[in-house]
Design a protein with these regions (language model features):
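Membrane-interface amphipathic segments in extracytoplasmic regions
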Residues: 1-269
Length: 269
């Protein structure tokens, strides 16, 4: 076992305690089909990974993809929802299950940039043609007909106003972790953190008995200046509103609020 196991194990225990306290107030139910669609199965190694967008999924999927079967499901391996109900339930009970989380403000900015600053499919990207049009229509004052038609050029304040008012539950790229992975309905063996990804990934591979594989080199991005640049564009009250929208993501996973935005809230300007 690795030399950091004691420290990592302690943090894991503390986090599981917070999860128990939070989920203890909720009635347990069967995971819905949307959640099961986020759980990727690597049957040979009895591992299930909940993919959370913008939390190192591009590092985990290629690694775990080495283990997919040749059953023709998808390039990333089958998802739990694709199995018969009885088998899916058994896998959820017996397989090693893990997910990763990220500081909520960082993840939200990463999602915005990925979908609206550098859209992969350009102006044909559905995040532009569907969500972009909606955001501009509802949250831009006096939008041009061109902007309404294209959905291109969503500004960060517009995106945040959309999230606060209606958008947090509309897409998993910016949904709460509870809605993506259903951690109150599924008992995860481990929840790792983007900020300590290399160490946490090694811990997961050890616990899942996959020590013959090595997690790819990774350096978590810490762009505090960029974060402050974007969030300084919105009113302080909106930052507080985001804290309420993502309250469970902050509280359960040990991220302080307002965390990296503390200087913005405390400033008098």
């Amino acid at each position: 076992m690795s030399e950091y196991r004691g420290e990592d194990g302690k943090r894991d225990m503390e986090q599981k305690q917070r999860l128990r306290q939070f989920c203890g107030t909720k009635k347990k139910k069967k995971p819905n089909n949307e959640t099961l669609g986020h759980l990727y199965v690597f049957e040979k190694h009895k591992v299930i990974f909940c993919l959370v967008p913008k939390v190192a999924s591009r590092q985990w999927i290629p690694l775990l993809g080495k283990y997919r079967s040749s059953q023709g499901y998808s390039p990333y391996g089958p998802r739990v929802k694709q199995f018969p109900a009885e088998k899916a339930q058994k896998m959820l009970q017996t397989f090693y299950k893990f997910m990763f989380v990220r500081e909520p403000f960082q993840r939200l900015l990463s999602a915005y940039k990925d979908k609206y600053v550098h859209p992969r499919l350009g102006d044909k990207d559905p995040f532009i043609t569907v969500f972009g049009r909606k955001i501009i229509r509802n949250f831009r004052q006096n939008p041009s007909q061109e902007a309404l038609k294209s959905g291109y050029g969503v500004k960060f304040p517009e995106f945040i106003e959309y999230i606060i008012n209606e958008g947090a539950q509309e897409d998993w790229h910016w949904a709460n972790y509870e809605d993506v992975c259903g951690f109150c309905d599924i008992k995860y063996n481990y929840v790792g953190h983007y900020e300590t990804l290399p160490e946490d990934a090694k811990y997961v591979l050890e616990r899942a008995n996959l020590t013959q594989f090595k997690f790819p080199s990774f350096r978590p991005s810490r762009t505090k200046d960029e974060l402050l640049h974007y969030y300084s564009q919105i009113p302080k009250d909106w930052i507080k509103s985001l804290g309420k929208v993502y309250q469970s993501s902050f509280k359960i996973f040990g991220y302080p609020f307002p965390g990296p935005l503390e200087n913005l809230l405390s400033s008098t300007s």
